[in-house]
Amino acid sequence: MIRLIRWNNVQSLVFKRCLFVPSNSLTNKRKRRIPPSKPRSSNRKDGDIEPYRMTDQNQTPNTGSIARLPAEVKKELKDLRSFTKVIAQHLKPEQENDSLTSAEKPDTSQLPPIDIEEATDDIFGEISGTKKLSANAVPPPPPPPGLDIPDEIKERLGLLSELLVPAKTSNNKLPEKQVENNWKLLLSQLDQAGGLSGLSKRSVSKFFSKIPPKNLKNLIPMIENMYNKAEMSIPHPIYYMFVRSLTLGDKISDSQMQLINKYFQEISKQTDLKIDHYETMILAYVKNNHMEKIDGILAQMKKKNIEISKMIYTSIVRGYIFYQKDHQRALDTFDSMKFLSQKTQPDEKVYTDVIVSCVMHREIERALDLYYELKDKGMNVNQNLLSTLAKGCSRSKQFKTQAWNFLFQVYDHGWVPNLQTYEHMLYIAARDGDVELTRVLFYKMLQTNSVTIRAFRYLILSYSKYVPPHKRKEKHLILLNHKGQLFRQNILQDVDFSKPVHGFPFLPSSHIPDSKFVLAESSAIWAHTVMNNPSFLRQQTLVASYVSIALELGDFTEFKDRFDSASYLNTDGIPKVREIEIIEPRQDEPTEKATTTEEQNASSETDNNSLIRSPILNQLQQNINDNQFKAPRDSYLYNLAIKAAGKFKNYGFAQEILHERGQFRKSNSFKLLSPKQQNQDDFQFAGYLVECWTNMNLLEDAYAVVLSSVDRFPWSWRELGVLNNAAMKLGSLELAEAVRKVAQVTQVKHHGKIKRQDFKTYVMKRGY
């Protein structure tokens, strides 16, 4: 209780210990005597709370301290009002029902009765400081330490400076967001309290250096404005802080790069650029994807006799790998790091990046050599490196048996597989056609709510790679390893597909009996994804795997249905031309036409009965008329379509795809490709078209495709072997000879491989 006391006509706030004891009229109990408090011991232990000082009216007060007290109270009240005003500006009144800012009033009718005498003792013990902690009681945690803010800035901020805590807080779930809001609030209050005027440059620089770079990125305009108001010049360390904050993240926009160049110009006016400045500058150009400007920076460093550091080499290597996609130049820079000096030796991070680049470009043997070189140097191996090598080995026929060995090394190191490792497990099992294992791994991801679009794509890929047991000639890769056998057996027994997770339509069986099972389940999963995650279905790679399931396991009707329902022709950029085709039937054809119509109707009824499709897809397609659940067709989808036309020998569908592929070449999506990529896609489609006509025994049409593009495409025996074998089988020796001549001419022209006898003949004709 606080009592107001007057001494010499001066008001003062003095704490008095008073206790309210209820009377008998309230308690209906006998009054009990309050034992007098024990005198305080002068030998107070460390950590005890010092009780409030007792004051007697007869005591002579310290008039000097009492006279200064009202001024301190006024200052505290002024700071408190300013603090309240700033807080009120940042509150959002619309969040009235927020569970974090509002609380329900407790129901007092459900509270137990209170023993007033016992409560009185507790209150007395609390205010007198004599209550002891129980044996099991846990003392409250100490408040987090505040930031070391200069005193003159702390005085200007007042109570608001106590809001700031260090960025590394363990008890806060959202430390970054909380600190960012506090810094913005703090700078606003500092600006309103006079800004930087009257403060020393050293204190200002020390204060701004406390701001984390991630938060500083959004506060740069406010800080520059505060410097301008105070008519102070920004020192070069602050400019460098701005640059470091702007270089955070994976990419840097052109506008941010302009700011970085501006700040570096200001730094160069105040001091000479050091190695740290050049390292940050090169890193910024790498993230801005302007590697061509790095040569000029290196030339400046050479003029100033500044050696190229290891960090600069690392940034250049990462730029060639992840931004420029120039694998060869990345390898050249990596070799320079190894043989230049001892200071520039690459560490495990650089080795990991180069190994990832080798895996991306299908150079698995080089990746393995670098891996063993890394181990010989005694460097640490991380989990992402092992999982990347496992994924790369699964793509190679020579090293695919080592894929699961690298994954099991993750368990040998005692690591818990992260999301990337788990996704690579899915990929290896899917690429191997192990549908049972892929389904189980995906089921585990459903249970932990960690499903990604990449994992879903690998599940669909496993269906497209499925081979029935009676046709499979090789064991699954995981069964070639003893650990793999135990791993597969245990995880299959641990999953019960009869208990669906999140309604995902897995069929209630862990065993895959035949291809109809795969067709039915993939169709049901596609329908479920249309209803719940339609954004997944707009990727061409996913649609290609979904369509390939019908190509490998179904018939033409199944393929045509999936091709039309999951993809569409993007007409952006295609010129609109009206085509009118007039067909006049002959007078002697009515009987044949009627017969043909009856046959088509009968075949369509048979196809509809044999179609394995989810009933939900039929209902969805009746209500959906646009392409929001489809992916735009690309060159790979057209390659699959023309391949299906040849496999199922459907001439009409082949003509339809051939015409639509011509329209696709006029679209914006094809025009945006590089000329090299366009030529490569056209050559692949031409190769599949030759195979299509060959499967239909239209050998002359297939040879016409080759002959019309002999000067454009590097035809080889890989594309022409099917046509040559078909010509030999049908006894068309002239056509086979013509195909062999085309292969010889194109191989010599495009510096390809030729046979030894053909090379001898070529050298004899050349004469040298």
Swiss-Prot record:
Domain of life: Eukaryota
GO CC annotation terms, alphabetical: mitochondrion
This protein's UniProt keywords: Mitochondrion, mRNA processing, mRNA splicing, Repeat, Transit peptide
Major site of localization recorded for this protein: mitochondrion
Originating gene: CCM1
Transit peptide, start-end: 1-90
Coiled coil residues, start to end: none
One Pfam short name: PPR
Role: Regulates mitochondrial small subunit maturation by controlling 15S rRNA 5'-end processing. Localizes to the 5' precursor of the 15S rRNA in a position that is subsequently occupied by mS47 in the mature yeast mtSSU. Uses structure and sequence-specific RNA recognition, binding to a single-stranded region of the precursor and specifically recognizing bases -6 to -1. The exchange of Ccm1 for mS47 is coupled to the irreversible removal of precursor rRNA that is accompanied by conformational changes of the mitoribosomal proteins uS5m and mS26.
Subcellular localization: Mitochondrion
Family: Belongs to the CCM1 family.
PROSITE patterns, alphabetized: PPR
Residue ranges, compositional bias (Polar residues): 55-65, 597-609
Official protein name in the record: Mitochondrial 15S rRNA processing factor CCM1
InterPro entries xref list: Pentatricopeptide_rpt (IPR002885), TPR-like_helical_dom_sf (IPR011990)
Lineage: Eukaryota, Fungi, Dikarya, Ascomycota, Saccharomycotina
PPR repeat extents: 274-308, 309-344, 347-381, 382-417, 418-452, 634-664
Assembly and oligomerization: Binds to mitochondrial small subunit 15S rRNA.
